[in-house]
């Protein structure tokens, strides 16, 4: 399956810019820059939306839902309904606490794994069978099992200067993985995306 709509999950207010939870937004911004696609607010689609041509001549649509994370599925459904896209043609990019920094995971299907944005996407697409690319944001250093406040402040916190350098390399790698999935299909891209660890630049 070749994705036709790529969605990055995040929260819309400026205070959430550059936070770990908004790495999905940052990924779509990186794709838009790489492919020269301009994103603009689209009320019908409840998000920032743009379309253009990705490498290989593939027509692609990009979306950043502006509904807040736990209602992301509304915006995704608005686009898929309008363009009559199947759920399987949607690639969703989002943050994952359980993956360390520098790791990414591309899968063809699966559960939400506790991620509210993905819960909403699954509910509105009425299927778990759509590809997703998870970007590792790591766990909080002082996490205690069951301490939700530590997790929330970590997820909604910003990357350190060193982490920001690493994440810019991760986003370059994400662009590479997505381009591979558009040219050769998600299955082929999974081997590359899931086997590599992006290393921090040597100081």
Curated annotation (Swiss-Prot):
Subcellular location: Cytoplasm
PROSITE patterns: PEPT_TRNA_HYDROL_1
GO MF: peptidyl-tRNA hydrolase activity; tRNA binding
The reaction(s) this protein catalyses: an N-acyl-L-alpha-aminoacyl-tRNA + H2O = an N-acyl-L-amino acid + a tRNA + H(+)
A Pfam family annotated for this UniProt entry: Pept_tRNA_hydro
GO cellular component: cytoplasm
EC number of the protein: 3.1.1.29
InterPro entries hit by this protein: Pept_tRNA_hydro, Pept_tRNA_hydro_CS, Pept_tRNA_hydro_sf
Superkingdom, taxonomy of origin: Bacteria
Record keywords: Cytoplasm, Hydrolase, RNA-binding, tRNA-binding
Gene Ontology biological process terms in this record: protein quality control for misfolded or incompletely synthesized proteins; rescue of stalled ribosome
Site, Stabilizes the basic form of H active site to accept a proton: residue positions: 95
Function noted in UniProt: Hydrolyzes ribosome-free peptidyl-tRNAs (with 1 or more amino acids incorporated), which drop off the ribosome during protein synthesis, or as a result of ribosome stalling.
The protein's name: Peptidyl-tRNA hydrolase
Originating gene: pth
């Amino acid at each position: 399956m070749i994705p036709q709509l790529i969605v990055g999950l995040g929260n819309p207010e400026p205070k959430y810019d550059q936070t770990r939870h908004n790495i999905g937004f940052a990924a779509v911004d990186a794709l838009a820059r790489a492919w020269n696609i301009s994103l603009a607010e689209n009320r019908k689609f409840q998000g920032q939306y743009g379309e253009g041509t990705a490498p290989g001549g593939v027509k692609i649509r990009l979306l950043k839902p502006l509904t807040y994370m736990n209602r992301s599925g509304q915006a995704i459904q608005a686009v898929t309904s309008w363009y009559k896209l199947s759920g399987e043609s949607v690639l969703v990019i989002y943050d994952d606490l359980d993956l360390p920094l520098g790791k990414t995971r591309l899968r063809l299907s699966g559960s939400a794994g506790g991620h509210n944005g993905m819960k909403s996407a699954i509910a509105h697409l009425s299927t778990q069978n759509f590809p997703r690319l998870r970007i590792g944001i790591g766990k909080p250093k002082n996490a205690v099992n069951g301490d939700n406040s530590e997790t929330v402040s970590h997820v909604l916190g910003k990357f350190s200067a060193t982490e920001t350098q690493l994440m810019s390399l991760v986003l370059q790698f994400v662009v590479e993985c997505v381009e591979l999935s558009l040219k050769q299909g998600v299955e082929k891209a999974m081997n590359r995306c899931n086997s590599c660890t992006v290393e921090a630049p040597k100081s």
